[in-house]
């Protein structure tokens, strides 16, 4: 069991967390201050220098004993693949793509991505707001030059209720005046 040099107390075990907890304690800090006040300035400086040099020398070999040291570690043997005899079976059956289509095997090309809107072969885009449903779609290059969007009616966008009225199914402005409570 390690012993604190300043407190004459045995620590429960030698770990960084135990030392850190002990070193931040009120009694330990008071004992450290008392120790250095008793030995005087000259001796205190030499003790501090020796402690610092021992930590520096120790830090060159291993700065933090809790960190992983790759040179000292022994590698674990790799697990055999799931399809290899003696390999670990997969924890669940192979997943499938949308609509129950199985995913392609590794290394094979998957299903092609659908084209983005506006590309050849893509489904047509819905009509713009305010345009009748039967209007032809703009050409693939975009809208014709100087295209004028329809002007919305006064009070907002098409399909919106006139100003001052609630949406359908909503109580009128000013609250619910139902007297059946």
Swiss-Prot record:
Protein name in the entry: U1 small nuclear ribonucleoprotein C
Superkingdom assignment: Eukaryota
Record text on subunit structure and interactions: U1 snRNP is composed of the 7 core Sm proteins B/B', D1, D2, D3, E, F and G that assemble in a heptameric protein ring on the Sm site of the small nuclear RNA to form the core snRNP, and at least 3 U1 snRNP-specific proteins U1-70K, U1-A and U1-C. U1-C interacts with U1 snRNA and the 5' splice-site region of the pre-mRNA.
Region annotated Disordered, chain positions: 129-181
GO cellular component, one term: commitment complex
Keywords: Metal-binding, Nucleus, Ribonucleoprotein, RNA-binding, Zinc, Zinc-finger
GO-annotated molecular function: mRNA binding; pre-mRNA 5'-splice site binding; U1 snRNA binding; zinc ion binding
Subcellular location field: Nucleus
HAMAP family per record: U1_C
Renumbered zinc finger spans (Matrin-type): 2-34
Gene Ontology biological process terms from the UniProt entry: mRNA 5'-splice site recognition; spliceosomal snRNP assembly
Residue ranges with Pro residues bias: 129-143, 150-174
Function, in words: Component of the spliceosomal U1 snRNP, which is essential for recognition of the pre-mRNA 5' splice-site and the subsequent assembly of the spliceosome. U1-C is directly involved in initial 5' splice-site recognition for both constitutive and regulated alternative splicing. The interaction with the 5' splice-site seems to precede base-pairing between the pre-mRNA and the U1 snRNA. Stimulates commitment or early (E) complex formation by stabilizing the base pairing of the 5' end of the U1 snRNA and the 5' splice-site region.
Family note: Belongs to the U1 small nuclear ribonucleoprotein C family.
């Amino acid at each position: 069991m390690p012993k604190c040099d300043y407190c004459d107390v045995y620590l429960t075990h030698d770990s960084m967390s135990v030392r850190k907890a002990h070193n931040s304690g009120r009694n330990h800090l008071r004992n450290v201050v008392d120790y250095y006040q008793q030995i005087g300035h000259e001796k205190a400086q030499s003790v501090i220098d020796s402690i610092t040099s021992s930590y520096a020398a120790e830090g060159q070999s291993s700065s933090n004993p809790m960190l992983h040291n790759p040179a000292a570690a022994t590698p674990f043997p790799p697990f055999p693949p799931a399809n290899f005899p003696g390999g670990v079976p997969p924890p669940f059956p192979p997943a499938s793509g949308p609509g129950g289509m199985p995913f392609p095997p590794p290394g094979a090309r998957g299903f092609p991505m659908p084209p983005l809107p506006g590309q050849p072969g893509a489904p047509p885009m819905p009509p713009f707001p305010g345009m009748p449903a039967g209007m032809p779609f703009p050409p693939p290059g975009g809208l014709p030059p100087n295209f004028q969007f329809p002007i919305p009616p006064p009070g907002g966008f098409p399909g919106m209720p006139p100003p001052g009225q609630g949406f359908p199914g909503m109580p009128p402005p000013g609250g619910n005046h139902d007297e059946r409570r």
